Amino acid sequence: MMNATENQIFVETVSDQELEMLIGGADRGWIKTLTKDCPNVISSICAGTIITACKNCA
């Protein structure tokens, strides 16, 4: 049994497109990222008819 101080590593297979979407490298992203198009941007989730990722480059 693992205690709270032990680290866990999870590996999941994703496509290049899914990875780019996650990190925001090509378009929008779901997590804090440093990208060529928008450095130091924290992505946010926007509500609408469909939940989408939004990047604010301001």
Curated annotation (Swiss-Prot):
InterPro entries: Lantibiotic_typ-A_Lactobact. Maturation of macedovicin involves the enzymatic dehydration of Thr-33 and Thr-35 into dehydrobutyrine residues, that can form a beta-methyllanthionine bond with Cys-38 and Cys-57, respectively. This is followed by membrane translocation and cleavage of the modified precursor. Disulfide bonds join C46-C54. One of its GO terms (cellular component) is extracellular region. It holds the Pfam family L_biotic_typeA. Belongs to the type A lantibiotic family. This is Lantibiotic macedovicin. It comes from Streptococcus macedonicus (strain ACA-DC 198).
